[in-house]
């Protein structure tokens, strides 16, 4: 008898998908884009008829010939070498960003950037963000908001109404992006008026808000790839086929304008690369970064934790406090060396202070404020206003300058709860914050000393860094002559380091130029920690002055500077940089002593007493576990040195040394061998074990001496002959 199936009830007619609901809007948007694109094309075709020759100056001074509104950066690159064109993603035309396929409009200078350049990566990932935006529209009918490139990759924020995206849906988004890339969709550019842009994006309230905030007379550029059209100043890749590999990493929640009272958004993160090898390397780095996550290591090593009773404020446990205090102690050593004076200032100030400093007008939403006896007070988010009060407390003489005030005061900033992230984004923190009050003629020397101090500190941690000089912006305040002198002083300080640095024109603060310092950890990730900023405005706001040599009142200049930045943030960076394997001088677990048996337990505690007297963190594992188990546990807990002591070591007053990486350094005298080496390792803040260095150095010296003796003997024999 044939199998029969139960009758299936007819399915309810499915409603239109979110994309189908938006399809008429998307179609209208494309129709308008094509209309304006045709208008652009007509202009270009008319301009081409002049056939006017142009000269293009390359970075090496070479001059290339071209035709106005015909020749593009791509054509110039192809004329030099095909590989140059294939590797060039972005052009700078007279310093301005330019699409590789966009025709040049006159005589100009030209510089090309590839994926290896930060500028090239930024463009590559920004173009990829448009592909992600297209995928989100096609898959979910999303209302797109903003989609920038970030440090490593990009994201797009979109509005899905009540819908959210789960981690399992990233695969579908990724497949859609891969399909778009294979379609080789060209990136097309148009320029429209404000009213035309409003018409084009009329059904996306987020884009309408962005457009409405622009001036009435603004010219707005838009880009299209496939059916997706977006507001964008560009430039972009020639087409989507330049994107070879895609990985959609995660979805998270966000809010429009980063305001929790506004519409909830879905943020989708992704990354792309021009070849599979780079993607494989990226995934390896991500896996390694997960293992090094400071939040994970913080729990494993019992360094710190967070609690819902005080979000964004860290509880440092005893082991974590040891590291934290060592960092502070290190900076205090440098302050002494560079003749800073440490001060202690209040945590709470009347809001009159913040009105004077300008924080009340520009920073209040990031401050914790409260009423005290009908007056408004605020927890300090930074130290500079308090230091200004300290400087202005009495009349100052030119002889007192430079005045270097250092402060480890506790700071509070009211970060959004959604932005809090381990130790890297907190509400309560401390900084190695200092302010230098100086004369104009002292600026250069003070800046040079700061950069030298910065280099010495980062070298101790094994951190590399890069520096950028950010010069005056368009809306700068103060005298041009003062700015010129300040920028020259910063430039001279940078040149004095002998290191390469970059110019970042127009990116200084309105109140003074600065050096932006980016640090790189062991995984080559970038972090902003240190800062040095000249300030001409705060002394004016607080009416600060000193009596000059001519017995006249003069305005000081303030240098804001920090090296660690937030101690909490640096703690997180170093945790991940060292992968929890703290160098001996910074380690909260320096020495574990393991007695072989009950007979050597007393000697183990004697060794501990000797080491503790010198300030070393050490413990004795006198549990009844087997010795091998004790050693293994100590290694897993990242004790730098494990000292095994038995009857022989007790008799000889020695210790048997091994490291957490199970490198055995053998038997050493307690005082002459162990203690002397540990003291030296701590003093020089070595990143490596000195026992191995000593042993190899001694062996090398012994070998060299033997070779020298053999050579001398040989020479003596020859002379006798």
Give residue ranges: language-model regions.
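NTP/phosphate- and nucleic-acid-binding module
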Residues: 1-145, 149-151, 155-721
């Amino acid at each position: 008898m044939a199998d029969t199936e139960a009758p299936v009830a007819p399915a309810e007619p499915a409603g239109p998908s979110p994309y189908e609901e938006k399809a008429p809007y998307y179609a209208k948007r494309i129709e308008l884009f094509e209309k304006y694109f045709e208008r652009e094309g007509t202009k270009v075709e008319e301009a081409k008829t002049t056939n006017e020759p142009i000269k293009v100056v390359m970075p090496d001074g070479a001059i290339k010939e071209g035709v106005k509104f015909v020749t593009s950066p791509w054509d110039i690159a192809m004329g030099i070498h095909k590989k140059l064109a294939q590797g060039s993603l972005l052009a700078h035309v007279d310093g301005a960003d330019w699409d590789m396929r966009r025709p040049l409009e006159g005589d100009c200078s030209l510089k090309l950037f590839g994926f290896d350049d930060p500028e090239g990566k930024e463009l590559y990932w920004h173009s990829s963000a448009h592909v992600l935006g297209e995928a989100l529209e096609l898959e979910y009918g999303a209302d797109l908001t903003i989609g920038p490139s970030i440090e490593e990759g990009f994201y797009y924020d979109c509005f899905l109404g009540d819908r959210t995206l789960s981690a399992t849906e990233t695969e579908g988004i990724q497949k859609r992006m891969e399909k778009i890339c294979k379609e080789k969709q060209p990136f097309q550019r148009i320029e429209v008026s404000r009213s035309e842009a409003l018409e084009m994006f009329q059904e996306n309230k987020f884009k309408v808000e962005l457009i409405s905030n622009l001036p009435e007379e603004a010219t707005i550029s838009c880009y299209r790839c496939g059916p997706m059209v977006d507001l964008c100043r560009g430039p972009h890749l020639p087409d989507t086929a330049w994107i070879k590999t895609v990985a959609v990493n995660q979805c998270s929640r966000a809010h429009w304008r980063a305001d929790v009272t506004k519409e909830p958004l879905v943020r989708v993160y992704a990354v792309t690369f021009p070849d599979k090898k780079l993607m494989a390397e990226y995934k390896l780095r991500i896996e390694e970064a997960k293992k090094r996550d400071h939040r994970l290591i913080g729990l494993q090593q019992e360094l710190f934790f967070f609690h819902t009773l005080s979000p964004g404020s860290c509880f440092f446990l005893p082991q974590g406090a040891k590291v934290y205090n060592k960092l502070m102690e290190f900076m205090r050593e440098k302050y002494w060396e560079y003749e800073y004076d440490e001060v202690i200032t209040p945590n709470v100030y009347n809001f009159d202070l913040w009105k004077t400093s300008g924080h009340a007008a520009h920073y209040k939403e990031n401050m914790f404020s409260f009423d005290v006896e009908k007056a408004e007070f605020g927890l300090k988010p930074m130290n500079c206003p308090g230091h200004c009060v300290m400087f202005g407390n009495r009349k100052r003489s030119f002889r007192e300058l430079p005045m270097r005030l250092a402060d480890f005061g506790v700071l509070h900033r009211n970060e959004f709860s959604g932005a809090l992230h381990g130790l890297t984004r907190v509400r309560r923190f401390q900084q190695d914050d200092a302010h230098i009050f100086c004369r104009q003629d002292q600026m250069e020397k003070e800046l040079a000393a700061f950069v030298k101090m910065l280099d010495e500190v980062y070298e101790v941690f094994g951190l590399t860094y890069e520096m950028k000089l950010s010069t005056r912006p368009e809306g700068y305040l103060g005298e041009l002559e003062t700015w010129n002198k300040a920028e020259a002083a910063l430039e001279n300080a940078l040149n004095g380091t002998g290191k390469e640095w970059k110019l970042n024109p127009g990116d200084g603060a309105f109140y003074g130029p600065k050096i932006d310092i980016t640090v790189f950890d062991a995984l080559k990730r970038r972090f902003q920690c240190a800062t040095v900023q000249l300030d001409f405005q705060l002394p004016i706001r607080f009416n600060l002055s000193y009596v000059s040599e001519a017995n006249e009142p003069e305005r000081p200049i303030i240098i804001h500077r920090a090296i660690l930045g937030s101690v909490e943030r640096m703690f997180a960076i170093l945790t991940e940089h060292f992968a929890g394997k703290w160098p001996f001088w910074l380690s909260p677990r320096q020495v574990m002593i393991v007695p072989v048996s009950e007979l050597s337990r007393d000697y183990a505690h004697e060794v501990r007493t000797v080491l503790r007297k010198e300030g070393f963190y050490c413990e004795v594992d006198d549990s009844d576990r087997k010795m091998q188990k004790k050693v293994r546990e100590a290694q897993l807990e990242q004790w730098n040195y494990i000292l095994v002591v038995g009857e022989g070591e007790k008799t000889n007053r020695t210790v048997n040394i091994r490291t957490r990486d199970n490198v055995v350094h053998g038997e050493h005298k307690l005082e002459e061998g162990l203690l002397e080496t540990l003291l030296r390792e701590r003093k020089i803040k070595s990143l490596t074990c000195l026992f191995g260095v000593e042993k190899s150095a001694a062996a090398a010296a012994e070998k060299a001496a033997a070779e020298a003796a053999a050579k001398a003997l040989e020479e003596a024999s020859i002379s006798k002959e």
